[in-house]
């Protein structure tokens, strides 16, 4: 698996074990994969609005044999989860206006 960029390593450092995370705009799924490899008790939902990006994430998740640890969902922002499913939101690699729109 490809190594995380320094930026994503910093993002990952704010996540704790036992977290219930949604990785919004997961792209290739690298951050989600990194988190489940780093933490044994974490739950991760990797989501993306772009079907091709999510397909790439699914491929990478399968390559790492992590299908049972990372759930994938196609959809926009927080629309793909219920409030009680998560306690940590990760939005990395998007512009400020996009992030504000997701959080509204």
Describe these PLM feature segments:
Residues 2-18:
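Conserved alpha-helix/loop element of class I SAM-dependent methyltransferases that forms part
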Residues 18-27:
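Conserved class I S-adenosyl-L-methionine
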Residues 43-48:
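Conserved SAM-binding motif I beta-strand of class I
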Residues 29, 33:
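Glycine-rich SAM-binding Motif I of class I
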């Amino acid at each position: 698996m490809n190594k995380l960029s320094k930026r994503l390593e910093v993002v990952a450092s704010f996540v704790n074990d036992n977290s219930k995370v949604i990785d919004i705009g997961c792209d290739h799924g690298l951050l989600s994969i990194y988190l489940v490899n780093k933490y044994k008790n974490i739950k991760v939902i990797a989501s993306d609005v772009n079907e091709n990006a999510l397909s790439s994430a699914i491929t990478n998740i399968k390559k790492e044999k992590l299908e049972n640890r990372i759930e994938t969902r196609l959809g926009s922002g927080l629309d793909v989860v219920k409030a009680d499913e998560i306690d940590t939101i990760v939005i990395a690699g998007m512009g400020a206006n996009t992030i504000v729109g997701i959080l509204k």
